[in-house]
């Protein structure tokens, strides 16, 4: 059903998946990352500040899987829950993931992707640059 591009991290490639149809893995992507985001129908990601800012700026339907409180400061949990509350994201805690639950969540997200795009489009934060420029222009008068 899906074509998957998996960014695994340095030293975490799984060679047993090399010939899997519809699946490509990379340790890291730098210059092409914005192109991959632009081409994606949906994004599955951790919930770090940079990731969620990129996802929301591009209005990509997304599934956030935050690092657990044991593996982080807890900021990713807060980020993901905030985005979920605003209707921007679907969230699964790492501890609750099963193959079936992950696949069903992805299918639901894809089916309802327009509602996530619409929620992100309505965000008052989407025109932050315009607001800042407006404030600067007002101050310059």
PLM ranges: what are they?
Residues 86-93, 97-114:
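C-terminal "capping" alpha-helix adjacent to the active site of nucleotide-linked donor transferases
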Residues 111, 125-141:
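C-terminal alpha-helical cap of glycosyltransferases
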Residues 37, 52, 76-80, 99, ...:
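A general structural signal for well-ordered alpha-helical segments in protein cores
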Residues 59, 77-89:
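Acidic, glycine-centered active-site loop in nucleotide-sugar glycosyltransferases
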Residues 114-126:
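A short, well-ordered alpha-helix in the C-terminal region of glycosyltransferases
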Residues 24, 39, 82, 101-108, ...:
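Alpha-helical elements of Rossmann-like donor-binding domains used by nucleotide-donor carbohydrate transfer enzymes
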Residues 1-42, 77-80, 92-101:
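Donor-nucleotide binding loops and adjacent catalytic segments primarily
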Residues 33-73:
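A donor-sugar binding/catalytic signature common to diverse glycosyltransferases
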């Amino acid at each position: 059903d899906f074509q998957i591009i998996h960014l695994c991290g340095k030293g975490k490639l799984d060679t047993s998946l090399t010939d899997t149809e519809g699946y490509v893995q990379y340790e890291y992507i730098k210059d092409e990352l914005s192109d991959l985001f632009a081409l994606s129908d949906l994004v599955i990601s951790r919930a770090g500040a940079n990731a969620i800012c990129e996802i929301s700026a591009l209005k990509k339907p997304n599934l956030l899987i935050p690092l657990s409180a044991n593996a982080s400061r807890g900021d990713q949990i807060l980020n993901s829950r905030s985005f979920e509350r605003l209707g921007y994201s679907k969230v699964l805690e790492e501890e609750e993931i099963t193959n079936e639950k992950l696949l069903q969540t992805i299918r639901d997200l894809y089916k309802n992707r327009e509602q996530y795009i619409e929620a992100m489009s309505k965000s008052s934060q989407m025109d932050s640059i315009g607001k800042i420029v407006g404030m600067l222009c007002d101050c310059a008068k």
